[in-house]
Design a protein with these regions (language model features):
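Flexible coil/turn and secondary-structure edge motifs
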Residues: 2-219
Length: 219
């Protein structure tokens, strides 16, 4: 399956998608995952999108934050039924944040992965199980050696049904863990696509850069 990102396209295009127009969902290209917002950011390679984020056709969206987004994205791209991915920044206050700003912890954003998936091939519940099993949701603002609010565990949901499923899955996951889960569950706000050099980092560099998964202590 080819989920390659056109880095040059993401870096060189200033995004301004009309709210009424739907771009086709090209594999691996975060530019075309969603309906844009007229007020979306226009910095090349750091293009912001406002809510709502909407896919074309029957596909659905999910946003997961579970530490350094390089390794998280690489693992998600290997899940059958995942159509496209983009790494970016979610859950913060500032508009159009840069990686440097997010890394300083000054914007409130978490490093996150936006996923487009085909629910006929992989359910949201299955993606949630993958989420709980591939990081430590009890470690607060950290994953392994990475420290800071940008590395916190979070699920950003689209609609009441995802919110309900995410909350139920958190309760179920807690039953098997010794320490309390710190994962934030919140409605998806603006998702800001990260700079082009972050997209599909591990795939382009031929290695798994982030030391994931980190396992929580089990009962």
């Amino acid at each position: 399956m080819n989920l390659g990102l056109s880095v040059a396209a993401l870096a060189g295009v200033a995004l301004a998608i009309a709210a009424a127009s739907v771009a086709p969902a090209r594999r691996g290209n975060g530019e075309n995952l969603m309906i844009g917002n007229p007020a979306c950011g226009k910095n090349p390679g750091n293009a912001g999108h406002g809510t709502p984020l909407v896919t074309t056709g029957k596909n659905q969206l999910a946003i997961f934050a579970q530490g350094c987004f390089w390794g998280v994205e690489e693992r998600l791209r290997k899940v059958p039924g995942v159509i496209a991915t983009a790494v970016g920044y979610a859950g913060g206050q500032a508009a159009n944040p840069s990686y440097e700003e997010v890394s300083r912890g000054s914007t409130g954003h978490a490093e996150a992965v936006l996923v487009e998936f085909d629910p006929a091939k992989v359910s949201y519940a299955q993606l949630l199980r993958f989420f709980w099993e591939t990081h430590d949701p009890t470690s607060g603002n950290a994953q392994g050696p990475d420290r800071g609010t940008q590395y916190r565990s979070a699920i950003f949901t689209f609609g009441a049904e995802q919110q309900k499923e995410a909350a139920a899955s958190r309760e179920e996951a807690q039953k098997g863990l010794r320490d309390p889960i710190t994962t934030e569950i919140a409605p998806a706000g603006p998702f800001w696509i990260a700079e082009a050099y972050h997209q599909q980092w591990d795939e382009r560099h031929g290695s798994l850069s982030c030391p994931l998964p980190h396992r929580a202590r089990r009962n």
